[in-house]
Amino acid sequence: MTRLMIALSAMVVVLFLLSLTVGPADVRPTESLAALFDDGYGPLTLVMREIRLPRALLAVIIGGGLGLAGAAMQGYLRNPLAEPGLIGVSSSAALGAVLAINTGLAASLTLGLPLAALAGALAGVFLVMALAGPQGGSLTLILAGIAISAMAAALTSLVLNLSPNPFAANEIVFWMMGSLADRSMLHVWLVLPFALTGAAILLTLGRGLDALTLGEDAAQTMGMNLNRMRLLLVIGTAGIVGGATAVAGAIGFIGLVVPHILRPLVGGQPSRLLWASALGGAIMLQLADIAVRVILPSRDLKLGVVTALVGAPLFLHLIYKTRKGLA
């Protein structure tokens, strides 16, 4: 376990440095890194500080958060098919962003789009908790999340269908594909408190998630407050997923696939999977973001498209291996 964590941490650092040096400009890696710490305000220094550094930081923050949220959600529901968007936060955040684009709020305010997405995420969480009720179990939480997610998706489609501005509709579609391009340090400071707060909350649930592997009755016998655990899970996941969707758009499969890949390596304890999934999620999103810039540098290839193209076949392969092992 210790060796695995060291290896994952080293990969995060290496990919972070690589992300800082990859771009359309033909500049040597040593020059790029030197420009980052330059006291001046030259073109390369501005590119490093205002474009590449925020992008690299967001890949680590968002990828790590989604991986952690996915592991926590799977541990709580005791379902390896669970993922962070199951409680409807990402769909609600997307609806808020779509409304901001369609009404012109995104164009009139610098942070209008991410703030509207965060407002949508908070509204979605409130509705999910209201529907699930204070005493509802995990099944009630899933059903409430599916209902809110379906409603938000339907309203998003309605806004797209009725949008009088074809350019706004086009912007909405491209935003929903997910991207870290054209992000600044403002976006980093916007998502950071939500991601850190959500991560801190989810990491405290490790002992409770371990107890849940024995069943809800056994966990309650061991002194676990399941209602409190569910509330903390929803709040932590909502902070991470809402902030990530607000800044980067819809990025899927990280919270679903990464815990699957790492679970055989860390064992059956959900608490041990939390940290590993956070590092694994950061690695996966950094790799995807680097691939976006390398594969088609002249085209605006969207990050969410790459994560889906890689994550879906990988997930199918994991399902096939699991089914084969049970045969």
Residues covered by each model-derived region:
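Alpha-helical transmembrane segments in inner-membrane proteins
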Residues: 1-327
